[in-house]
């Protein structure tokens, strides 16, 4: 029988413990917890003065990031003072930061608010986060921003003290730390001097006007704020054009560039490129090869590899049209429906081998009644056969096709991903073969031919005693050829549309619904279409109104129209004298 070990009293060590669960901590427990829970971290892409995403970033020599417009307004109100540390700061001490960004953004507000894209390392293209060690390499009045891992691996350890972007020399003293995950206290909002003194976040003049007008602060919305700003600018532009009597529906032919004084214009370091239709999900590997071999020309762009027509079509769910083939045997003909949508490689292999006559004269070497019949091996041993690529190809189990009925056509194999040229027809549903053999077709006509094959006697090794030969396989409808024709037709149609667009568009594009034709300069002119409504009324009026000469008017007598007498109304009249 055991004894209890829990003491009925509190020990000295438990009473004097310094943690929050000590009985001696008293009422200070909640106060200590509140002090540790009040930590607020400024995101790396936020201005330290406005506490909002920056547009044109600059930094101080100690690595504090500001927006150039915001810090300019602050220094006008508080000359020679850093809002974060309170130390002396002048405009000439600010360093312009060159951030790189990718072409597309996956997160709200992750990039600069005046353009699209996430902030990235310009060499490795890794997206910056709040946990990335970010540094800047200073070159006078500007600095290029990198991840610390890139600079440490390619500059410091390699002893190559040249900037990886513009090839400028630098020293270790030129490296400025913008964000260090191990030193989160440097971005703690509770330590900012201007917040301790009760000052509010500094805003630009434009942001102050928006706040006074009660509008939404678009800068705090990230990429959504850009759309709001563009919509508001378009409405304001249309209102001004309407006041000046201009045509608000006319498209602008020129874009004006903002020329704000003291604003640092930062151009995108990566150009947007429209990917080709047959672009792969992986790159050509030239950048990796040039980094690892000095014998290759340096390459920094992650160019996408291009797929061939065959590789492009052999992606699942690319070619969705079904194909048809006729298998001619000495027992009769079988009409087969092929499914390239879910098994494109198996269907392509079967069609190409059939078109080259690979299956002509090939016998079915294995026949098991109430199970299946197998063929496709020119050697007839069951151990031969070769695919159209000359090697095994992978299984395709992602589709919904299963061995759910008689006449199912599947690939025979020796194990996982060992498909070649052999195939088999199922005599009955065989669900135990699902996800073991690729289903790529089914018999849709002359299913009774399978019954004739099933009734052929076999020897002890399931080999038919009477040969069942494949005379030929005729492809009635090639889905891949049809896909290529449709693709070429679509490309030709797209080129024609682009050609017409460059020439100014069609007649329908040049004419509005009111019948006005749009000129090349954007103005409008009336056409005959504008007079289509009511044009016959003018002709009728002209025909019904005869022309009168002034000489004829002299012989016509004129008279005054007699004054019409007022009709007396019946009834009782006025009742005033009653």
Curated annotation (Swiss-Prot):
Q: Which organism is it from?
A: Gibberella zeae (strain ATCC MYA-4620 / CBS 123657 / FGSC 9075 / NRRL 31084 / PH-1)
The uppermost taxa in this organism's lineage are: Eukaryota, Fungi, Dikarya, Ascomycota, Pezizomycotina
Span list, region Disordered: 240-260, 505-578
Q: Domain (PPIase cyclophilin-type): give its ranges.
A: 321-475
A Gene Ontology molecular function term of the record:
ubiquitin protein ligase activity
UniProt lists the family membership as follows: Belongs to the cyclophilin-type PPIase family. PPIL2 subfamily.
Q: List the GO terms this entry assigns under cellular component, sorted alphabetically.
A: catalytic step 2 spliceosome
> What name does this protein carry?
Peptidyl-prolyl cis-trans isomerase-like 2
Bias class Polar residues marks the residues at 538-548
> Which pathway does the protein contribute to?
Protein modification; protein ubiquitination
